[in-house]
Amino acid sequence: MRKIITIGESILDTVYHNHQPVSAFVGGRVSNTAAALGDLGLPVSMVSECCTDKVGDWVVDFFEKHNVDTKSIDRYTDGSTPFAAIFKEDGEQDMIVNYGEYPATRFNVIWPRIDEDDIVLFGSYYAIDQPQRERLYDLLSYAAERKAILIYLPGFQHGTQFNLTKVMPSILENFEVSNIVIDHANDINTMFPNQDSDKVYNNHIKFYGPTYLHITPGTSATIYKGVDKTEVPFSCESDNHLGWQAGFIAGVIHQLIARDIKHGDIEFMESGVWSEVVTNAFDFAANCAEGDSNAMSDEFAQAHKIG
């Protein structure tokens, strides 16, 4: 079976409400998508880095619990595993403070085997942050040469400090190497202020050629491909946005494998097929968003296993 390689930051999210601790869980769209794919019985590996501390153990245990291969997670000894403190106050916007310390040498990971038609998922600030950018992009370029399907999740967590001018070349390089780009409203507002998805696609993505899936939370997903634009409506009442997004992305990848859609097929996929892929992905999203764990139910996972 085709393999799935996920590349992203290993981070622990801790949530506080009105100054009281509420929950702690492994955060990030890439990490939670990897977990969902592992629950589906798909061969998925995580390429990342975390310290040999207790938080790092927690993160690695999370992946292993969800059947994600962790051989490509570098366990460094100098520093600490990153974690984000998310402060939720009634009537106020969430405030996020990021902690953690990486070593001087970054992304010293064991490269996973990548073959033609494998799927590589990457994104967020981890995919553009300068300390590991060069080594990470070498891996992405290798995956593209091997004719894997590359899926890019642009955007980054609220509270991340960055210089947009400095990271924009890396964002555009990621567009260029990708076959599919998936984002939501908050992503483009951060990267391209005062531009809607039409402008973002036409001004920044279309030139490079990837299919663009833009999510408007609670309303629809819009598919951009060449000159075609297709809107697929949905309704989601859950406020578990991380679970919903992870489920949706996992659903898209599941459909690419279930329908035997390969690297050479992406460019020629018709809008009708994309609409079916997205519609099915909504079911995965809804299931992962039902609880607080960001994970799909055992019953749903069993019902959607391939082969």
Per-region residue spans from a language model:
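Structural motif
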Residues: K3-I5, D94, D118-I119, I180, ...
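Positively charged, low-complexity intrinsically disordered leader regions
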Residues: M1-P21
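Conserved N-terminal subdomain of the carbohydrate kinase-like
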Residues: T14-Q20, L42-S124, Q302-G307
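Short catalytic helix/loop segments, enriched in acidic residues and glycine
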Residues: Q20-A35
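Alpha-helix C-terminal capping segments
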Residues: A34-P43, K88, Q255-I257
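Conserved phosphate-binding/catalytic region of the ribokinase-like
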Residues: R2, Y142, Q195-G307
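Conserved beta-alpha-beta core of the PfkB/ribokinase-like small-molecule kinase fold
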Residues: I119, S124-K199, T219-S220
